[in-house]
Swiss-Prot record:
The record marks R501, Q502, N637, Q638 as: Cleavage. The lineage of its organism: Viruses, Riboviria, Orthornavirae, Negarnaviricota, Haploviricotina. Residues 305-485 are annotated as: Mucin-like region. Residues 554-595, 615-634 form a coiled coil. This is Envelope glycoprotein. Keywords: Clathrin-mediated endocytosis of virus by host, Cleavage on pair of basic residues, Coiled coil, Disulfide bond, Fusion of virus membrane with host endosomal membrane, Fusion of virus membrane with host membrane, Glycoprotein, Host cell membrane, Host membrane, Host-virus interaction, Inhibition of host innate immune response by virus, Inhibition of host tetherin by virus, Lipoprotein, Membrane, Palmitate, Secreted, Signal, Transmembrane, Transmembrane helix, Viral attachment to host cell, Viral attachment to host entry receptor, Viral envelope protein, Viral immunoevasion, Viral penetration into host cytoplasm, Virion, Virus endocytosis by host, Virus entry into host cell. Glycans are attached at N40, N204, N208, N238, N257, N268, N296, N314, N366, N463, N563, N618. It comes from Sudan ebolavirus (strain Boniface-76). The record marks L57, L63, F88, I170 as: Involved in receptor recognition and/or post-binding events.
Amino acid sequence: MEGLSLLQLPRDKFRKSSFFVWVIILFQKAFSMPLGVVTNSTLEVTEIDQLVCKDHLASTDQLKSVGLNLEGSGVSTDIPSATKRWGFRSGVPPQVVSYEAGEWAENCYNLEIKKPDGSECLPPPPDGVRGFPRCRYVHKAQGTGPCPGDYAFHKDGAFFLYDRLASTVIYRGVNFAEGVIAFLILAKPKETFLQSPPIREAANYTENTSSYYATSYLEYEIENFGAQHSTTLFKINNNTFVLLDRPHTPQFLFQLNDTIQLHQQLSNTTGKLIWTLDANINADIGEWAFWENKKNLSEQLRGEELSFETLSLNETEDDDATSSRTTKGRISDRATRKYSDLVPKDSPGMVSLHVPEGETTLPSQNSTEGRRVDVNTQETITETTATIIGTNGNNMQISTIGTGLSSSQILSSSPTMAPSPETQTSTTYTPKLPVMTTEESTTPPRNSPGSTTEAPTLTTPENITTAVKTVWPQESTSNGLITSTVTGILGSLGLRKRSRRQVNTRATGKCNPNLHYWTAQEQHNAAGIAWIPYFGPGAEGIYTEGLMHNQNALVCGLRQLANETTQALQLFLRATTELRTYTILNRKAIDFLLRRWGGTCRILGPDCCIEPHDWTKNITDKINQIIHDFIDNPLPNQDNDDNWWTGWRQWIPAGIGITGIIIAIIALLCVCKLLC
């Protein structure tokens, strides 16, 4: 006990020492953070590192890798366009590199392609390779192709991004995104007495559940995959398809799927039914998800009438006396008028359909708000004018032509359509087409004042299978990638949409910046009135109060000018920070690409050492000083209550005092008179 008592400090000294130690620890934690910190799922940057003009890194610990998706550069993401960027080669071994942080992908792909002999075209994923887990749309394609090579590579030299692994080849049955690997060079941490805690290794999941969104699957069938001319079919169900021959978005495919299933334009036999789209049908429908460099508004087309028409029937009999039928149909437009408008970014996720019997509304079960996808595909075919659906939440009118009879009437009137055990597999097939008029509906819009009836709600029939699947985060079995949106990855570098600074209400409360300049005549009048007895001091007060109003107006104007200047400086600081950040990222990417030749400086020499200086702290200090001097200080009361009483209020205390003295003298005289 005696030994322990020797180590104890007095209470007051212990408090001072502990307070000093805590201050040092907090200061160390606040100011010793490196440039980039990979925590959980977001690459957060706390300071900008100075550009190092060297042909090699001082330490590999300074290098952090980030996976960036190609769709952020505006490449086409639909299946027909994406497959043209992939090709097969032989004799080149695959390469796999790891990365630590990445973006959320808008479009991912999943391929299962077979050769004509039934063998697999793509290799299975090696151990440890998991699918890219953060995809809004997964385009799952199956089919056949020649596959002239051992592996499928990217023709542009990009990577195929998986879960924290980037490979040069495509693996079978695994979700992947197209992208590149960029490298950030972080500041080397300083060695101090009290070291900050080590950076936590990036976890393979995202703790922030609010950043989740559902993953939707779209299924395709591809013929002649990997060749110059291939055919891509969007799968509605096992026997109903849509030929994709033009730019399209996932939102368009969702709406087309809902429309076909609502009107039961499905194959009711074992044969295939392939719908084609007219040349002028607008398949570029929907909004971009989060890429700010892409369009955020799209045309809205209202009042369309769609028609489903059977074109041809092909029958081929095989050795087993069974026939394989492929029926082709065309989706065309019979609208007489077209209206274009701009759609807000947050449109409701549903497709409204007008039919002659009344308004019906079909919820789009697999679409979410704010979807945006890049599009680009092959050449267009067919010949009739058409325009498909508007964007989410828009109305369209649908009518069908072709047979002129319902399916029940066709079956009852045509003996060839009557099913029998002997002829069921060889009968001529006509798709089931409901009869609707082609006249324009006169039903007022649902939200218009003239609408008197409530629109019934129709849902997709339960017995209809759909190729559009939605997987929610809690149902997913794969672990997450250290991913985030574009604003999450480089947010603190200046790329995130920051909320605007709240303007101090005290600075703009009742502040009037309008100045009143006193003229020479007003000054002479005030000076002349000042010589009048008993009235002069009041006139001087009026003149002085006018000067004070002018002074307050000057202060108010300066405060507003300081506020606007501060906002302009903040925008300028953000722009320069973004530009400097992009410069550093591009420089590091160039150094990585030229590393085999010694780096950029080895090639350019001294010209490469152009350092983009970081003046962030200097500008921030000036902004804070302006805010402290002009904006955060409270304003005096600026009530505009000028009246005849203004200017005389300062004489009230003096008048009260004089009146009190006079009353005291009178009272004293009265007392003396009474006593005498």
